[in-house]
Amino acid sequence: MAELSSLAELGAATGNTNTQAAAPVHVQKLDKSGRAYATGKRKNAIARVWVKPGSGKIVVNDKEFATYFARPVLQMILNQPIIASNRSGQYDIVATVVGGGLSGQAGAVRHGISKALTYYEPALRAVLKKGGFLTRDSRVVERKKYGKAKARRSFQFSKR
């Protein structure tokens, strides 16, 4: 058998000339109004998010986001994907979120904003993926087991 020095020669020898797989092409996904729509999830919260070009206004459940998420930590969580993609003040964001508590809701809106930004501007996908904003945080509360006080905590043990 002849020695092959490269993958191209191997492809030519076997008749397979396409040695490179086609990379997935991400295209812009917009609705009829020119908005990008995405859903985000975190714990028990589900957020529906719409993104369109604008002045940077963020509305959550018909309230200004600073009113709905009063704690600065939650506001920071919401702004993370916008700051990471360097798009602050360029998009108006409208979100409706149901279920869970405030922390889970903030995480769900963040996830939805990240996905909607990638639908509107596919070039941002690499930046947001590297920051971990596109990954769904799958951690949920562990269920309580029978014979235990909580999910893992046992009842107090008395030796005598």
Swiss-Prot record:
Superkingdom of the organism of origin: Bacteria
Pfam families (UniProt xref): Ribosomal_S9
InterPro entries documented for this protein: Ribosomal_Su5_D2-typ_SF, Ribosomal_uS9, Ribosomal_uS9_bac/plastid, Ribosomal_uS9_CS, Ribsml_uS5_D2-typ_fold_subgr
Claim: Transit peptide is one of the keywords in the record: no
GO terms assigned for molecular function: RNA binding; structural constituent of ribosome
Cellular component, GO, one term: cytosolic small ribosomal subunit
Keywords carried by this UniProt record: Ribonucleoprotein, Ribosomal protein
Example GO biological process: translation
Similarity comment text for this entry: Belongs to the universal ribosomal protein uS9 family.
NCBIfam families per the UniProt record, alphabetical: PRK00132.1 (NF001099)
Protein name, entry field: Small ribosomal subunit protein uS9
Protein's organism: Mesorhizobium japonicum (strain LMG 29417 / CECT 9101 / MAFF 303099)
Source lineage: Bacteria, Pseudomonadati, Pseudomonadota, Alphaproteobacteria, Hyphomicrobiales
